[in-house]
């Protein structure tokens, strides 16, 4: 039986950031009248391993969404940041109906769609096993993963340029949910396995253009990007413009703008989703 008449958002996180990192964003969306459900960590369930082009992660999202749609009685909006945006797009393309309800729309948060020669180059790099030296996986595989306590974790991330602009509560949520106590005394560990993070980077989808030709989206799509996003500039926006039919909005911030400006992100997400209706 339906548990709520509120619109349902299935949110998918960015690589290495468990869904609980986005708690401030989720609370703001709930205050705006949405239900928000999310898989906590992609890539950590052995039933859905990380492989090239992420088919099992897409299936994990499809299975989770179907369950949540059936529980709530509401069709889902698929919203995702970075990795999560790509998974949302592929999931909606392959599964226009989830839980016996048509997907209402896809919203990409700084997930620019790779196509054309860049996708071909990525495919070549993957086949030649060179992708690990050119993707962010070159950094993630050496990422620091243990500290003595929470204060040391907080000091570590506060000193990082990528985290310097984060909302304070979001950073605290990341320390709380993105790390955990180890079995040894004085040990705080990264919760998102850096080997999984690296595997996700090294298996980036090079087939999005072909997938969307075989399975055209049956629902509207939109994109919200960060004005200072390096990732967006690297990938280009040609495919994104085509898929979203120009439904593009920009917010001040980097690729990680949902962590930097969670309240502004929630307002933009609401505007984009209401525009689908």
Regions found by a protein language model. Give the residues of each.
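Conserved HGGG/HGGXW glycine-rich cap/lid loop of the alpha/beta-hydrolase fold
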Residues: 4-46
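The conserved beta1-alpha1 loop
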Residues: 10-14, 81, 225
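Active-site loop/oxyanion-hole signature of alpha/beta-hydrolase fold enzymes
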Residues: 38-79, 93-99, 113, 119-125, ...
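Short glycine-rich catalytic loops that host catalytic nucleophiles or stabilize transition states
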Residues: 39, 249-254
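Gly/Ala-rich beta-loop-alpha elbow adjacent to hydrolase catalytic centers
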Residues: 80-84, 88
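Flexible "cap/lid" loop of the alpha/beta hydrolase fold
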Residues: 101-146, 233
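Conserved serine/cysteine hydrolase catalytic core
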Residues: 169, 178-241
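Catalytic histidine-centered segment of alpha/beta-hydrolase-like enzymes
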Residues: 253-266
